[in-house]
Amino acid sequence: MSTDAAQWQLVIPMSGFGERFRAAGYTVPKPLIPVEGKPIIEHIIGMYPGIKNVLFICNQDHLDEPRYRMREILDSICPTARVAGIAPHKLGPVYAVSRAYDMLDENAPTIVNYCDFSCVWDWDAFRRFAAETNCDGVVMCYTGFHPHMLHSTNYAYVRTENKNKVLQIQEKQPFTDAPMHEFASSGAYYFCNARLMREAFEETRQREDLRLKGEYYVSLAYRPLLEKGKDIRVFEIDKFRQWGTPADLGEYQCHMRYKVAEAAGFSAPRQKGTLLLPLAGMGSRFAKENYTLPKPLIPVNGRPMVLQAWRALPRADENRFVLRRDMPGAEALVAMLRREVRARELSSSTLPQTARPGPACWGWMA
């Protein structure tokens, strides 16, 4: 199999209505919503440098609406791409792709990519992985903490053997009570060729057990392949950005605004008096999500949560942190605060006082 990106084909079904975005006040179809200065669909094409054979499968109503300029925008993003317009439907991405089978090279390696996310990953390494394993399909996945997973597990999840070979895949629910420790599908799906993809899609459309609330999802098209003993793998991506709902997109944009402000340096004027941070909660909701650290110590962008909160607040002459005596890891938390905040004095009913240069910092057990 060729690893030359020019020999591969990328299929992007983007014919959905985007009703949640429309209800939230967005005035263009979801793939055209701007994120960081360019439409979502441009971010997706940017994931595949060097690819030429691209097929956009669009809602014909969107193509016909002059305000959207959809065809013009797609042509400018990927001049070598083809655009297929299909009738509006609510049958899901598998159905959308099925309307354009005849536009695909049945022998070419094929990726079906949803139109509402982006990621940081190694595209070259992925093509080598597909060639070296000679597998039949790959689900591009992420794992670990991602903010959107705190309020929803409405994604496709994969159960694997040795974190590589897919054993099971299911939509809209994780396999365990610890979804952040599972592989979740990014929304990008590889098939060794379009002929195999078509066979899987057609069998999926014939099976009611693979239809979810009236829609056919690409993830579930791997079920027939797994049942036939096909070799389906997982390829882990580095960083994932979910924009599938207005809440997902808003959360991402808020996070990025914070990152920009953090990089520029927080500039609130120094305050006289005392900065008081209560850390007395036990973090029960995080514990239910299988976090093992006390909430103040959970890493956020590489630093404990309490330090990120402290860094974002105005500097003060004194810093006081209030901890519960029975909080698991309380002593480790106090030691970290001593070290990181460079406390001049830290006292509690159970821990000795220590003097260090820098702003005054006291901690005690409530």
Regions found by a protein language model. Give the residues of each.
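A structural signal for short hydrophobic beta-strand segments in well-ordered beta-sheet cores
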Residues: 32, 158-160, 234, 297
